[in-house]
């Protein structure tokens, strides 16, 4: 594992503790992409630390969380927020959030790394594309695009189910995915190594083509 900044090591400790305390938690967002990437040889070099953590939570575990943490509602984004030590956590509750993939689906297919549940690649792709659509013109949008690329690279080396990936994929998600695959972030991730960037793009494009073959825009909502 690459050397980590001490702040991020502490965040990972808090993530592990939250995951241990609440049965209904599954991590999403950048922290989930990191845990997938760092645990696979093909993508570990591209794993990127994050400053906060997002998770989906069941209603029963949300009640337990309220008893321990001081949650601040964010009705505009349909989530709750809290601080644990110095770190920010965004909480998306079952049947209360507007995330495109239902909680039950995400939890049913979640995978674990060292006891921490994270969304499967197929669900994480759609959740990340939702963020990428909303923030594509910002610096956050660039990070979203890189996370989408990491997911595609992971999908190249894993049993990626394209049919599951498109089940909740909207036309805007698919369009943004195409822009990302054709975009410039591969060069940035490869730190200017044109040969590596080309290989990464080819591998990501293979997974995109699998998705494109089964995606039906008529079923998009």
Give the label of every model feature segment.
Residues 1-221:
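Compositionally biased terminal segments of proteins
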């Amino acid at each position: 594992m690459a050397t980590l900044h001490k702040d991020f090591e502490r965040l990972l400790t808090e993530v592990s503790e939250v995951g241990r305390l609440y049965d209904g938690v599954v991590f999403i967002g950048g922290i989930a992409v990191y845990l997938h990437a760092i645990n696979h040889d093909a993508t570990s070099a591209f794993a990127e630390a994050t400053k906060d953590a997002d998770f989906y939570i069941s209603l029963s575990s949300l009640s337990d969380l309220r008893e321990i943490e001081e949650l601040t509602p964010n009705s505009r984004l349909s989530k709750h927020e809290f601080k644990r030590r110095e770190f920010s956590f965004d909480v998306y509750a079952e049947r209360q959030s507007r995330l495109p993939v239902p909680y039950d689906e995400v939890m049913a297919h979640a995978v674990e790394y060292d006891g921490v549940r994270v969304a499967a690649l197929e669900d994480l792709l759609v959740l990340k594309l939702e963020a990428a659509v909303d923030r594509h013109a910002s610096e956050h949008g660039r990070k979203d695009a890189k996370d989408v690329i990491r997911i595609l690279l992971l999908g190249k080396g894993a049993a990626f189910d394209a049919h599951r990936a498109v089940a909740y994929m909207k036309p805007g998600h698919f369009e943004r995915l195409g822009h990302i695959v054709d975009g410039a972030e591969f060069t940035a991730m490869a730190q200017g190594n044109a040969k590596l960037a080309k290989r990464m793009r080819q591998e990501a494009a293979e997974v995109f083509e699998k998705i494109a073959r089964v995606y039906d825009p008529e079923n998009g909502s």
